UniProtKB/Swiss-Prot annotation:
Pfam families named in the record: Ribosomal_S16 (PF00886)
Native species: Pelotomaculum thermopropionicum (strain DSM 13744 / JCM 10971 / SI)
InterPro entries: Ribosomal_bS16, Ribosomal_bS16_dom_sf
Keyword Metal-binding: no
Record-given protein name: Small ribosomal subunit protein bS16
Keyword Ribosomal protein: yes
Length: 88
């Protein structure tokens, strides 16, 4: 089972809110997921990114792949800097 960390769109029309989830890569964007590890609200100024870093790092160690957007958000939240520091 290929697992990805990606965004799941929530909210109303023209008012998106995203949950950062771990899901099987074959499931639809807003479909079934394994675990919710955070959220992203782009409408707030500044945009709010809240991620459970411990769970995200745990899934990355298990081999989960990041979508491009999830990678950018985790980098901005400082989660991926923690993985780079662990390798040293």
């Amino acid at each position: 089972m290929a697992v990805k960390i990606r965004l799941r769109r929530m909210g109303a029309k023209k008012a998106p809110f995203y949950r950062i989830v771990v899901a099987d890569s074959r499931s639809p964007r807003d479909g079934r997921f394994i675990e919710e590890i955070g959220y992203y609200d782009p409408l707030k100024k500044p945009a709010v990114i809240n991620v459970n870093a411990e769970r995200a790092l745990d899934w990355l160690k298990k081999g989960a792949q990041l979508s491009d957007t999830a990678k950018a958000l985790l980098t901005k939240a400082g989660v991926l800097k923690k993985t780079a520091g662990e390798g040293q």
